[in-house]
C-alpha cells in the first residue's frame, strides 16, 4: 500500500450498522409488520401496496435521525455501515415473480434519505461504508436479502448486471462526498454460490466502482460468502488492485454447536479460536473488517428461518450475572476484532432485542460508553 493510501486508511474503524433502516428486517422492527403476513421488504411492499409509501417514509424519517449520528460521534464511534437495497434509485430494476402483479413494488425516495445520511456523517465526522445488502433475486435467501427463502441472484445475468449497475451509481453519486470510505459489493452471498462466479462479479464490481472512486479515496469491500478466507488468497492484490478489504461476519448463535456453549465457551471461542483465525487472516495478507457481530447468543427473537429449540445459555443467571456475562463476551470479541482494520456492531438500533442493539448495550453497560482512542482503557465513570 502506498504512503498516501496507508496514511488515510490506517485509521481503525470502530463502527455500527444502520440495519433495519433502508432495508427492512422484521425481527428488528416488528411494529412495522404488525398485522401483516409479510416477512421482508418485498412482501411488505407487495402486501401493503400504495399504503407502503407513507409507512416507510415515516420509518425512514424517524428510525435514524441526526441525533443518532451525534450520539454515535459523542460515543467515539467513527464509522457507520449502511445497508441499501437494489431498489434504492427507483423503478428500473428487473422483475421477480415475488412482485406478483406489481412490476415495481418498492417505495421510492430512499436515495434522498441516504443523501441526508451523508450530510449528517460529514457534520459529525463519521465515515460511511455503503453496503449492497439486497440484490435482485436475493443473494442468500434471508429476509435481509430482500426475499425470504429465495436465492436466485446468481442465476440470471439481468440480476447480476443490475447489481453492478447499482454499485456504479453509488460510486458516481457519492464519490465526492468526504464521508464515503468504502463500498461493499454484496452482503452475504450464500455459501453454495460458486466461488469463481463471486470472484468474477467482485472483479467487475471493483472496476465499476473505480470508474468514479480512486483507490486513495475509497476502499472496495467484498464479503467472504461464508467460506474460508483461504479461497481468496492472492485475490485482488496489488499492484493491479488497490485498497481492497475482505469482510467477515462473526456470530455465535446460528450453529447449534455454538448455541449449546456456556458463556465460558463463548468467551473462549472469541479470544482463542477467533484470535487465531485473525492471526491467520492477517498473515495471509488480507485487510479485513468484521462487518457484523453482536452479543446475541440465541435466535429466539431474531431468526425467521432457523428452527428451535433455542437454547439460552444465560437463562439460569440473575440480572447481575447476565450483565457480567454480556460485558465479558463483548470484551472478548472486541479484544480479537481490534486486530483487524475495523469492525461494525450489528446493529445500532432494534425495537425488542437489546443484545443486538448497540445503543442499548452501551446504556446497559455491556459495551463501553466511549470508543475514542483517548478513552480506551480509562475509567469513564
Predicted features, each with a name:
Residues 19, 24, 346:
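Structured beta-strand/turn binding interfaces of compact recognition modules in eukaryotic regulators
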Residues 1-17:
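N-terminal module-boundary/linker segments of secreted carbohydrate-active enzymes
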Residues 315, 319-381:
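Aromatic-rich peripheral "rim/lid" segments of glycoside hydrolase catalytic domains that contact
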Residues 131, 223, 249, 346-348:
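Conserved beta-strand termini and adjacent loop/short-helix elements that scaffold enzyme active sites
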Residues 139-147, 190, 196, 202, ...:
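Short, electropositive alpha-helical surface patch
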Residues 16-19, 83-85, 249, 292-294:
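Short loop/turn segments at strand-loop or loop-helix junctions that form parts
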Residues 11-15, 23, 27-219, 224, ...:
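Active-site mouth of glycoside hydrolases
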Residues 165, 172, 179, 186-331:
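Extracellular glycoside hydrolase catalytic/binding regions
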Amino acid at each position: 500500500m502506498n504512503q498516501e493510501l496507508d496514511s488515510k486508511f490506517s485509521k481503525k474503524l470502530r463502527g455500527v450498522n444502520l440495519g433495519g433502516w433502508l432495508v427492512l428486517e422484521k425481527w428488528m422492527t416488528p411494529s412495522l409488520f404488525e398485522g401483516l403476513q409479510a416477512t421482508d421488504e418485498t412482501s411488505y411492499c407487495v402486501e401493503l401496496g400504495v399504503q407502503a409509501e407513507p409507512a416507510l417514509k415515516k420509518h425512514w424519517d424517524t428510525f435514524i435521525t441526526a441525533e443518532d449520528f451525534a450520539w454515535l460521534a459523542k460515543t467515539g464511534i467513527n464509522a457507520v455501515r449502511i445497508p441499501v437495497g437494489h431498489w434504492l434509485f427507483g423503478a428500473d430494476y428487473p422483475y421477480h415473480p415475488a412482485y406478483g402483479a406489481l412490476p415495481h413494488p418498492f417505495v421510492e425516495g430512499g436515495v434522498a434519505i441516504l443523501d441526508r445520511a451523508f450530510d449528517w456523517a460529514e457534520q459529525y465526522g463519521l465515515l460511511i461504508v455503503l453496503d449492497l445488502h439486497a440484490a435482485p433475486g436475493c443473494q442468500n435467501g434471508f429476509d435481509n436479502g430482500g426475499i425470504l427463502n429465495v436465492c436466485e441472484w446468481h442465476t440470471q445475468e439481468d440480476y447480476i448486471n443490475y447489481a453492478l449497475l447499482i454499485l456504479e451509481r453509488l460510486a458516481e453519486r457519492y464519490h465526492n462526498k468526504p464521508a464515503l470510505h468504502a463500498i461493499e459489493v454484496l452482503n452475504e452471498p450464500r455459501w453454495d454460490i460458486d466461488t469463481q462466479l463471486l470472484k468474477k462479479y467482485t472483479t467487475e464490481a471493483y472496476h465499476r466502482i473505480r470508474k468514479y472512486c480512486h483507490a486513495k479515496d475509497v476502499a472496495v469491500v467484498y464479503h467472504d460468502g461464508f467460506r474460508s478466507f483461504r479461497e481468496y488468497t492472492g485475490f485482488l492484490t496489488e499492484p493491479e488492485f488497490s485498497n481492497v478489504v475482505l469482510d467477515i461476519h462473526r456470530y455465535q448463535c446460528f450453529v447449534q454447536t455454538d448455541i449449546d456453549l456456556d458463556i465460558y465457551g463463548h468467551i473462549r471461542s472469541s479470544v482463542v479460536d477467533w484470535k487465531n483465525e485473525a492471526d491467520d487472516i492477517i498473515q495471509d495478507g488480507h485487510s479485513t473488517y468484521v462487518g457484523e457481530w453482536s452479543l446475541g447468543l440465541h435466535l429466539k427473537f431474531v431468526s425467521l428461518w432457523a428452527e428451535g429449540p433455542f437454547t439460552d445459555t444465560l437463562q439460569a443467571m440473575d440480572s447481575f450475572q447476565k450483565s457480567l456475562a454480556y460485558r465479558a463476551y463483548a470484551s472478548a470479541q472486541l479484544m480479537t476484532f481490534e486486530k483487524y482494520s475495523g469492525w461494525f456492531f450489528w446493529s445500532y438500533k432494534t425495537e425488542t432485542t437489546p443484545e443486538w442493539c448497540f445503543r442499548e448495550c452501551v446504556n446497559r453497560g455491556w459495551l463501553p460508553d466511549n470508543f475514542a482512542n483517548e478513552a480506551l482503557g480509562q475509567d469513564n465513570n
